[in-house]
Amino acid sequence: MSVRLPQSIDRLSSLSSLGDSAPERKSPSHHRQPSDASETTGLVQRCVIIQKDQHGFGFTVSGDRIVLVQSVRPGGAAMKAGVKEGDRIIKVNGTMVTNSSHLEVVKLIKSGAYVALTLLGSSPSSMGISGLQQDPSPAGAPRITSVIPSPPPPPPLPPPQRITGPKPLQDPEVQKHATQILRNMLRQEEKELQDILPLYGDTSQRPSEGRLSLDSQEGDSGLDSGTERFPSLSESLMNRNSVLSDPGLDSPRTSPVIMARVAQHHRRQGSDAAVPSTGDQGVDQSPKPLIIGPEEDYDPGYFNNESDIIFQDLEKLKSRPAHLGVFLRYIFSQADPSPLLFYLCAEVYQQASPKDSRSLGKDIWNIFLEKNAPLRVKIPEMLQAEIDSRLRNSEDARGVLCEAQEAAMPEIQEQIHDYRTKRTLGLGSLYGENDLLDLDGDPLRERQVAEKQLAALGDILSKYEEDRSAPMDFALNTYMSHAGIRLREARPSNTAEKAQSAPDKDKWLPFFPKTKKSSNSKKEKDALEDKKRNPILKYIGKPKSSSQSTFHIPLSPVEVKPGNVRNIIQHFENNQQYDAPEPGTQRLSTGSFPEDLLESDSSRSEIRLGRSESLKGREEMKRSRKAENVPRSRSDVDMDAAAEATRLHQSASSSTSSLSTRSLENPTPPFTPKMGRRSIESPSLGFCTDTLLPHLLEDDLGQLSDLEPEPDAQNWQHTVGKDVVAGLTQREIDRQEVINELFVTEASHLRTLRVLDLIFYQRMKKENLMPREELARLFPNLPELIEIHNSWCEAMKKLREEGPIIKEISDLMLARFDGPAREELQQVAAQFCSYQSIALELIKTKQRKESRFQLFMQEAESHPQCRRLQLRDLIISEMQRLTKYPLLLESIIKHTEGGTSEHEKLCRARDQCREILKYVNEAVKQTENRHRLEGYQKRLDATALERASNPLAAEFKSLDLTTRKMIHEGPLTWRISKDKTLDLHVLLLEDLLVLLQKQDEKLLLKCHSKTAVGSSDSKQTFSPVLKLNAVLIRSVATDKRAFFIICTSKLGPPQIYELVALTSSDKNTWMELLEEAVRNATRHPGAAPMPVHPPPPGPREPAQQGPTPSRVELDDSDVFHGEPEPEELPGGTGSQQRVQGKHQVLLEDPEQEGSAEEEELGVLPCPSTSLDGENRGIRTRNPIHLAFPGPLFMEGLADSALEDVENLRHLILWSLLPGHTMETQAAQEPEDDLTPTPSVISVTSHPWDPGSPGQAPPGGEGDNTQLAGLEGERPEQEDMGLCSLEHLPPRTRNSGIWESPELDRNLAEDASSTEAAGGYKVVRKAEVAGSKVVPALPESGQSEPGPPEVEGGTKATGNCFYVSMPSGPPDSSTDHSEAPMSPPQPDSLPAGQTEPQPQLQGGNDDPRRPSRSPPSLALRDVGMIFHTIEQLTLKLNRLKDMELAHRELLKSLGGESSGGTTPVGSFHTEAARWTDGSLSPPAKEPLASDSRNSHELGPCPEDGSDAPLEDSTADAAASPGP
């Protein structure tokens, strides 16, 4: 041969130059002659592989369509790889870019850490020289060439010095594998090329230029840089071997499948060359045997090109169903399919008709978007809320779903990128990529391959749990049907198909026990043969007929399947041994790859250990053989899977078979046994896999084996004759099948519970793996639960024994789901399910910390009876079972004739099932909430409250969250001011709202403050804990995501919190739950747990001198009633105060956009009697919430509506009355005198504040509250007047409930404080003693101010309200106690109070009234009037549903009178009692005593209860009329 042949060999050997010596690389023989191609054009194509370094790829490109290398960074990755300026880029990663835009080329280059470029540039001889110049080694080393005799048939060994040394045992880096593969492949290419060269005549036709270099730094772990130049042969040689010029060969994205086939192609080309050629350094050449493969004209370049393009973009994938099927197989087995399935279903929705899109939209919501959806996809919450809203309203959701698709796209693109990485490693054939080779652009063939891929998908689906597999199957069917691809039916519809699918049904119902089959059946034999050939496929879902057409092209006598990196590497390491495989010997485990890619016959070939593999792998294989010998029952078909998993586990420790996390991030499908999954992650844990498992099988397998169902028990039609089925209607057949499914799945569930008991619970208890407390949480009452289901299964068996057709099943259902049996089931199930999530978290922690427990869990979960399910999957089976009962019963009802007793009973059983499920869900929720509260309590930091001066927060310094029940929690933003917001985690407890601020791991309880409106220096402090019986909830009109919480406590001024939710739906949820919690807290205030440090009872004791009400509440108003109310509170308007009883209306006004929040506060309701503008505003802030706690009665709503009507009447008529302005002016004057603050803005103390320092003398205050003629009959009228309005029990915000006597105590305190403060009071005009009650007419309000009638003492029509003024500066402390509830004494009337007298004496009133300023009051009234109307409308709507009951109630209330206490919630009974003269106390009782005892006596103070009330029941009853 010519001397140039060794040069050629040497040129190609530079591919593996990692181990070459420097002289070798710099030998002068490397200079080459130009090829034919380069002679004509002067340009050659070459391929380079560039690895990105810290500076990127190190080159820039320019141009469009013709993309050129613009610049190369000196010393960068591109320069090391041999890229030159001016080179034209022909291909990127095997993709032709001659017609691609500049941006597309850049995108392709940046798609990974490696890029393979095919460049067209000037003759590379200069590059070869420059490359040599970079090598510092001396040149001119002599070359030794010799002719070596032919070696045996296997490929020759590369030069000894180029063989890499032993690799570290645990080195998993992908780059090292890739380097090793490329080296070995390229060495073989050298030899193959030498076979080819003689075929093409003289040396002039041999490649004279071009080289393939792979330069790596010494000690580098991977393929850092390299320059690849493929031989450029003559035109005919390039045509024959086009693959040689394709960068796909050495691109990081090239599959070893292609490499294997290229090698085979070359072997075919050179198989007839028998003349040995010379080689350098001992390289041998020998003739090759003729091997004919199935693909003579295979062009891997074209295939790689096309597939690379398709697997880059989802849009292209959608247009190629076969490629999409391959990608789906990867997604279903190695990643989360939810985003892709959601995207595809949304695509169908976009193109569906309106009718179809409505139903499909709901399915998409239920499967992908709902909170508990089985395939939940994460999209922005606002987008999710918008989709929900549109679907609920049957609106078109195409636009928002399109946005949701875009939100899911990044995750899908990441999965596509991961799959491309898998293809780079040669793993594409695992997912059926080999089938794509046969497409050839034939649409029919494309459809067939797609259907084949989807059939394989069905087998993968069968290994998922049913709650995931069913929706995944639905989504897949939806899209494929839309694309016109026929998908394998999950549940065949006709009888024959059902019979065929019976053995496979367990794949779709993982809880179904596998069926027993007689050992002599043909299916058994087929299954055994199948297992012998492919044992690993038992647990990764091998289809009945292989769905992958893989080609077996041996590269050496030891056959290696394409697509398995581990075996390819192992194969090349074993090449030097030339040993034939020993049949039947143990082979190395190959991880989770299907074995039909690794073996083609029933014999198992051993892949011997490589040079760098330790003996550890052999020891582990011995142990894995032991694991196969564990005893098992004949029905235990999954034992082979467990043994295979053990081998899988052991094989991972070999360095030659280890893969990096990048190469196989998830080396096994999601359905692989847990032991197999964990073993690859932690191979060191596999040392005792055969110790506990056999012991378990010997002890417990006998108990488990009896749980297997009878043959074909899962298919009802297999249990009855064809003649029986033929005589039934289709509806009855369907009904029997559903009943049979109920029976079979119940038996399967019972079996699962026994597995939990025998394999986990009993062993954990026996081996003390968990403390008893923890074990009791994980399995609290497992034996009881098993007994319940066992007894039901026995009843089902008895029913089944009666005959093949079950006529009636309702009695059996009711026996389990109704009556005492239902109570038993729901209690036991709730107890079992409550702590599961908590216990599973505990198990997770123990597995991380305790290796012994970790080993136990691995062994137990790998037990075949667990059916590849983990403990967390098994333990939730009870909860899953409870959800399936209503569905199964619904299906039975659907196929049962309506109107029959059977149908009715089944409907009842279904409803009871739903109640059981609801009960258990609530129990689980409450338990988890308690657990979370315990965690929050540990992180709670309330130190800031200890330093806070806020009285509201003081009592929560030692707040204990665990003593309360949590209703809801979530993030909210608190708008403290326009410029200040705070992110909170808010807890809604049964009686409190807690605003927590997160700081690191702590949850802070911290008071915040802001400047109060109206004063630049004073600040208002907000407590982070709010009592629900003192709050109101209102929406923010200008922000649909925000709502107000108005807190009204006696401990401080009213406060408004503006909280903002993430979405409007979140806000609605918060408001609904808050309102419900407020109702419950005000209805049952005693039920809420008391604070750890309740307020001191000191101030309350003196107030309770009189008889106390039967219901005692620890209310702020009760505790702190004696404290004068703060001066710092801004005031309200007089008109607002006028309607004192209407605190609900006032409280519900926060949405008004007045001057500021303080204005809203001023409008808040106050439980006191005074309606003075300023006083009322101030007062409202504190007392309101105290007035709320009252039991809820239906009549309370009616009373509230009556009060609204009455207040509305007075609000409307007040400004029309001639004395209106006088009252206002009179009200302002005394207030100015009494308080330093502006009369209309604020007051230092409230008329209703007990013991206020500024009370007027008794006479003065009494005058304010009394009418003109009261001097003679003062006690009755005063009492009545005060009681009538002030002491009407306040009603709750939502229902208008009247407060019980306790509220009256508060009001009494308030009244006394009003007098003390000298503030205004609004009282109802009372009739003079002995006068007749005049029925109130709507017009009677006009006569209210008329004092002349009252002066006579005989006429007082309607409910007349007057503003009572303090007489002057507070004189005596005794007057404080004068509650407004106690009537003022006649002598006190004249005492300096000109205002009351004008009211009482019409003549005097009129002149004074004009002097007052009505405009502000009128303006204020407008808002209140409209708000009152709104509230009244709401209440009347609610009253419509109980109109009849309301009328009866009015009748009963109208005629009722009580002597001692007023029934809580009854306005009319109170009125009746007040008008009852027999109850009136002595006429001249001191006011002081009244004020002190009034709040204990009920709705009215002692005096007030006796005073006749002018407002009759008739009046009250006449006004509402819903």
Curated annotation (Swiss-Prot):
Residues 1236-1245 have a biased composition (Polar residues). Gene3D superfamilies: 2.30.42.10, Dbl homology (DH) domain, Pleckstrin-homology domain (PH domain)/Phosphotyrosine-binding domain (PTB), Regulator of G-protein Signalling 4, domain 2. Residues 444-470 form a coiled coil. One of its GO terms (molecular function) is GTPase activator activity. PROSITE patterns: DH_2, PDZ, PH_DOMAIN, RGS. Residues 521-533, 601-637, 1112-1124 have a biased composition (Basic and acidic residues). The modification Phosphothreonine is found at residues 254, 668, 672, 1462, 1475. It is found in: Cytoplasm; Membrane. Its main location: cytoplasm. The modification Phosphoserine is found at residues 2, 14, 16, 35, 245, 251, 255, 271, 556, 635, 663, 1155, 1295, 1300, 1457-1458, 1480. Ubiquitously expressed. Interacts with GNA12 and GNA13 through the RGS domain. Interacts with RHOA, PLXNB1 and PLXNB2. Interacts with SLC1A6. Interacts (via DH domain) with GCSAM (via C-terminus). Found in a complex with ARHGEF11 and ARHGEF12; binding to ARHGEF11 and ARHGEF12 enhances CDC42 GEF activity of PLEKHG4B, and PLEKHG4B, in turn, inhibits ARHGEF11- and ARHGEF12-mediated RHOA activation. This is Rho guanine nucleotide exchange factor 11.
